[in-house]
Regions:
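Thiol/selenol-based redox catalytic cores and closely related redox-interacting motifs
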Residues: 99-100, 104-137
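Thiol-based oxidoreductase modules, predominantly thioredoxin-like and allied folds used
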Residues: 73-90, 106-117
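Sec-dependent N-terminal signal peptides
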Residues: 3-14
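Extracytoplasmic/secreted proteins, especially bacterial periplasmic and envelope-associated proteins
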Residues: 58, 62-65, 90, 94, ...
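Conserved helix-turn-beta segment immediately C-terminal to the redox Cys motif
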Residues: 43-45, 53, 57-82, 100-103
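Amphipathic alpha-helical repeat scaffolds
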Residues: 29, 49-53
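N-terminal "domain-start" segment that seeds a small globular fold
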Residues: 17-38, 58, 122, 130
Length: 137
């Protein structure tokens, strides 16, 4: 599995410079499967940094409610990251169990990534390089 993640990361790094759309990225899900964001063309996407030991952990319940109500047209993707105060120390399996057991999460979750720093995930590096980073439209 680590080998797959490593190869996937290298591929994303090498192709990142040529990407013009978020739909050109793939993510690795919390289950270790590759999910192409191109599958969500025509839908709105909401990317949410998540952490199981954060003061905002209850956001999972609200996100799940939104997913249940609008999931046909809106794709929610949770991106667990341990970049802020060590609030997501668990493994992918730990995170998945926590989210399912405590909040009934059924929206898409990525594997645990880094969203800042030297080891930033390629998708978030690309997002940060885009104009209109405030996402105000």
């Amino acid at each position: 599995m680590r080998y797959l993640v490593f190869i996937f990361s290298i591929f994303n790094f090498l192709t990142m410079a040529s990407q013009n759309s978020v739909h050109e990225f793939d993510i690795i899900t919390i289950d270790g499967k590759i999910q192409s964001l191109s599958a969500f063309k025509g839908k709105k996407m909401l990317f949410v940094n998540t952490a199981s030991q954060c003061g905002f952990t209850s956001q999972y319940k609200a996100l799940q409610n939104i997913h249940s109500k609008y999931g046909k047209d809106l794709v929610i993707i949770g991106f667990p990251a341990n970049n802020f105060g060590g609030q997501e120390p668990g493994s992918n399996s730990d995170i998945k169990t926590f989210c399912s057991k405590n909040y009934g999460v059924s929206f898409l979750m990525s594997n645990k990534i880094s969203i800042k720093g030297k080891d930033i995930d390629p998708l978030f590096k690309w997002l940060n390089s885009q104009k209109n980073q405030s996402f105000n439209g």
